[in-house]
Amino acid sequence: MRMNKRTLLFVSLVSAAFLGCQIFFGYRDLKSCQDLAEKQRAISEQILASTEQLSVVPWTASLEESESVNQYAIRLGNRLLLLTKGGSHPEVYSRGTYWSLIEQTSTFGGILVSLYGETGQEVLSKGSSVYLPNQRDAFPVLVAEFRSNQEPLVFLGEYKDGKIANKAGAIYGTSLVFLNTGNGFVPLGIYNSKEECVESLDLPMARAVVFADKENPTASGSYYMLSNEYMQIVVSQESGAIEGINLPFASDQEENKSIVNEIGFDRELAINSPSEASFPGVETIDSQRQNIANVVGGYYPLLRRGTLSDVKKRVPAQYQALNIVSGRELASPVATGFRVVSFDNKTLILESGDGGIRRTYSLGEQPYAFELEIQTTQGREDLWITSGVPEVEIMSNAFVPAVKYHAVKKNKSDLFNVKLPKAKDSLLVRNNATPQWILNSNGYFGVILTPRIPIPAGYASSFIPGNVVPTRLSQLPPKDQAYPASKYPGYTAMLPLPKEAGRYQFMVYAGPLADPTLKALDRANANSKGETPEYVDAIAFRGFFSFITEPFAALLFVIMKFFKFLTGSWGISIILLTIVLKLLLYPLNAWSIRSMRRMQKLSPYIQEIQQKYKREPKRAQMEIMALYKMNKVNPITGCLPLLIQIPFLIAMFDLLKSSFLLRGASFIPGWIDNLTAPDVLFSWETPIWFIGKEFHLLPILLGVVMFAQQKISAVKRSGPASDQQRQQEAMGTMMALLFTFMFYNFPSGLNIYWFSSMLLGVIQQWVTNKILDEKHLQHEVIINKKR
């Protein structure tokens, strides 16, 4: 019995302790839950206080019913959204107003979402949609969580991959999710907390939001085109941004004003991948609402268009030109789903589905330029306008993208280079300058954004993997091998927009970085004082020695333009330029040749001295220098003509990379079709290392001429060649081979220049050798008999 009492006492104490722990921890959990609920309620009230358009209101089925029955709705302006089960009411009462049922839709678990408003009131047009892909970066949303018999909690969450995340805690109740479009809130869908997914709502107010199909993300989109004699501008209805800018090729037709020449890549794509060389490239509508038929060739795509034959590989909307983006990586468009407000031959006006953003594209009279006006009805921070991603240009066998901006620093206006971001740090944002304009260039072409109104300080540039925005060159056979997409990443340039609502104008130049067009643009945009934006600075000489060669290149181009005016051919201009330079340098070259001939005549005597004083190298050197002095010979003089020509050679190289007018300029059709690219005598399918798929004849001719010059400049000898002579001959042969390989992939214009220079040098050498009779030259050699 005593044992039972002890056991009972022990059990009682343990039970009491357990109950005490339960009460203690339960109270603590309850207190924690109450604190969390109070915190969530405070956050909800704070958000609702700062959001005028959206509010939580009670409702009843009739005026007689009390509003204290804990039935709540979300009010969006002049609309009510209700969640009910078992049926809906044709009319409800809230805050002194009757609301009529517009439409209802059934969702998971038998929940009805009903839309109420004033009878006869217009609803959102079904033709305006906001397309949201299922996979994209997270973006902020507003969530109204309904809990049993409680006022809904409103908080900020994140939407990604169809799920909602709440940093303040888990989501337990059914929730309505709203998207802030910049002009208010639009229902994004209803959130099922058990399944953790968002379902779209089939309601007029929510039809503005469409979840795009992964397999066909742009199936619902249309494209509109503005065009003139300088460009085609293809605008996407889905994004409101520019899908493509296509520049027509120059032709002999009187109405054609383009200066863009067709090059080999254009012809090769039209033959091997016609779908990728079609223009406009997508199903496009003109101002007469007529479909525009695609044509193969005839245009240059300034912007990358991805793979036109594969919808999934087209350029994503966030990388299209003149889109407005935000977010951590500046890669989230702030509005999608636009409708046409007005469309004629010169102007296209688009408005987002919620009316928050209006875009106006206007063609002007200036070549390759147009105007963009952006109108926002509600302010928002961290908005940026993008330049788009220029197509790839191969300049002297190199890929040379560049982002630059023009600004005033230290009371001086200048053009500044932007360091291109890398894959690891794909976004570069700087706030240390206020660009007057920003340029995104591929070398020969560029997109220039010029704000017409003051904007915040700063600029940005982003790195985009080549597989995301593939270049058209990756379609050349063998596909993605000759020019693999991954090897050619894209870059965008961005300017910030003011955070206040208003109208913002930009002048956009999208075309060749050519002297005549940029000067015309400068004149058209000069202010009352005659000051210009200095767009012509966008033409920059490139290379490590550009600070030295730029004056030479400018001089060469002036002479070439003069000869082009006389002959009508850039190729002949290069040859005539070479002749002029040879005439200018003739006295120096003649003196150098004469000096070298003397050196060759002195060679036997030098060998005799070296043999005599081979044990006294210092004495031999003194005797040789005395021999040079008596005959007025300097060994270095033979190098002077070549040294003087080097700046002109490098200047010509820079000129061919910087002068757009030479791009696509033909000299001998079928062989030399582009002076800024290697000549092509014939080609084949399978690439060969170093040689590629094309046979370039000019570098080989250059090597032959250099070899001939070395043979002509050698002195005729009666006996066997000395070691020094054999060494000189071997060096000459090696130089000819070296220049052949070095110049093999150089532009044909540079090869024409150097080949012409070498050929004229051979002729001058041969003539000089004839004039300088060997007997007379031998008498000019003075020997020190006393040595």
Curated annotation (Swiss-Prot):
Residues with lipidation of kind N-palmitoyl cysteine: 21
Subcellular location: Cell inner membrane
Pfam families for this protein: 60KD_IMP
Protein name according to UniProt: Membrane protein insertase YidC
Signal peptide boundaries: 1-20
Species of origin: Chlamydia trachomatis serovar D (strain ATCC VR-885 / DSM 19411 / UW-3/Cx)
Keyword Lipoprotein applies: yes
Gene Ontology molecular functions: membrane insertase activity
Record family assignment: Belongs to the OXA1/ALB3/YidC family. Type 1 subfamily.
Assigned GO CC terms: plasma membrane
Keyword Ribosomal protein: no
TM ranges: 170-190, 565-585, 636-656, 688-708, 735-755
Subunit annotation: Interacts with the Sec translocase complex via SecD. Specifically interacts with transmembrane segments of nascent integral membrane proteins during membrane integration.
